[in-house]
Amino acid sequence: MKHLNETTNVRILSQFDMDTGYQAVVQKGNVGSKYVYGLQLRKGATTILRGYRGSKINNPILELSGQAGGHTQTWEFAGDRKDINGEERAGQWFIGVKPSKIEGSKIIWAKQIARVDLRNQMGPHYSNTDFPRLSYLNRAGSNPFAGNKMTHAEAAVSPDYTKFLIATVENNCIGHFTIYNLDTINEKLDEKGNSEDVNLETVKYEDSFIIDNLYGDDNNSIVNSIQGYDLDNDGNIYISSQKAPDFDGSYYAHHKQIVKIPYYARSKESEDQWRAVNLSEFGGLDIPGKHSEVESIQIIGENHCYLTVAYHSKNKAGENKTTLNEIYELSWN
């Protein structure tokens, strides 16, 4: 991976065990004002769990499978503003749907972003058409590309609910970033009712850029794993990164980090102004006898986040199992 300006001056402000009761990675954690949410893949279904901080996060409230499924690391609150009919938006969340086998990827990625309303859409769903949704994510922004080359697709919302990020990866290499006004996105979805899609190619955006060396295993790539995206109120973009540990009788733990793309340095030519939080050298997330896998990032403010981390260890049969999912509140400078 490419060397960036690094910091290890990290502070753990709080932490807690999600205690989901199920041995699987929490791919996305979200700490809300009332509840804590977790996204796990359970028997092929994207499952959203909910609970209170300090207790078990183990109540399944949403299960997406079939055409409503697909690998996703997106679970983002849609904001606190009223909809186009003057109704409260509380209860609406963004999540990835519609599985798609992509050339060059072993993962069945979600290719659309749906908006789910927990007030009336909890429980199991089998079709992406159960929800209003954003489609043609590969056509977002100023640099569209072929849909069969889209190997990641995620969404994020800024803490003040003004900015909406679509982040995709083309051909397991090129990172595409498009920032929208969140009100614009929500209003377009409101206009579509309960089950139609919005073609992102037709939606006005605020900024769009690509990083052609974002992802890969070579020394010129920024990250070798993308576990989560988020952005702060100023438009700084953050990426959490760590591959799952290799397991072949022994473990090999991969480098863990958070990469920050400043709002004033959104180009490959400005990568010398990017920052990396070196969590491996920091060491504060390491637990004896367990091997970490950094998962999602939830930005609270600039250089301040909740970070979800899964931990793996061997059981008595020598099998690799996920044995713990922690959420850490971190800050750094």
From Swiss-Prot:
Keyword field: Antibiotic, Antimicrobial, Bacteriocin
Superkingdom to which the source organism belongs: Bacteria
Record InterPro entries: Helveticin_J
Disulfide bond among keywords: no
Any Gene Ontology biological process: defense response to bacterium
Keyword Plastid included in the entry's annotation: no
Function noted in UniProt: This heat-sensitive bacteriocin inhibits the growth of closely related Lactobacillus species.
Protein name: Bacteriocin helveticin-J
Species this chain originates from: Lactobacillus helveticus (Lactobacillus suntoryeus)
Taxonomic lineage from the root: Bacteria, Bacillati, Bacillota, Bacilli, Lactobacillales
